[in-house]
């Protein structure tokens, strides 16, 4: 059982480290959105909600899954350098506002990104010390196709495009820090949680360590 004191100590330590960007990426249908939802249940990660110009699906809520905007508005923000990353995917634009990311990281909170390879590459280039990336693979192409059809929210043309782009996405697997084959959902969640927890205690992120250790060394024992 976690005590009140332990919670307070954890909060103080969190405020003395910079947050990082925890990226989940995968071909469409490999499971990154489902995995993201399960990870967010712990309350340790804050979801980065992207802006997009694509049409809202029946199951989606504006402001919860995405911020849905027009192409004209997206291009205005893009040209004003408001995005820390943006990409054109399946003919639509997706992007993350720079200001929202910096506001969260400065408080020691970590952000979860559900983005494609294009967005991942931009974040890795612009914030190399602040990114941890995980690539999710399907167990087979047959299973990937099955998942896309079970979702039943895209036309046949869109499904064909997603399958074509999936093979391109998978060619970039070496660009990620970690790679997981999502055959068993519970096992995949467990692996990703382990990766996340290990990354939170990396020495270079924990600003509190140096004064804490200096205090330990200087501490007098009666």
Swiss-Prot record:
Molecular function in Gene Ontology: ATP binding; guanylate kinase activity
Subcellular location: Cytoplasm
Catalyzed reactions per annotation: GMP + ATP = GDP + ADP
A Pfam family hit: Guanylate_kin
Enzyme class per UniProt: transferase
PROSITE patterns for this protein: GUANYLATE_KINASE_1, GUANYLATE_KINASE_2
Binding residue positions for ATP: 26-33
SUPFAM superfamilies listed in its UniProt record: P-loop containing nucleoside triphosphate hydrolases
Start and end residues of each Guanylate kinase-like domain: 19-197
Gene3D superfamilies: Guanylate Kinase phosphate binding domain, P-loop containing nucleotide triphosphate hydrolases
InterPro entries registered for this protein in UniProt: GK/Ca_channel_bsu, Guanylate_kin-like_dom, Guanylate_kinase, Guanylate_kinase_CS, P-loop_NTPase
EC numbers on record: 2.7.4.8
GO CC term (a single one): cytosol
Broad class of the protein's primary localization: cytoplasm
Keyword annotations: ATP-binding, Cytoplasm, Kinase, Nucleotide-binding, Transferase
Homology family: Belongs to the guanylate kinase family.
Biological role: Essential for recycling GMP and indirectly, cGMP.
Name listed for the protein in its UniProt record: Guanylate kinase
Native species: Bartonella henselae (strain ATCC 49882 / DSM 28221 / CCUG 30454 / Houston 1) (Rochalimaea henselae)
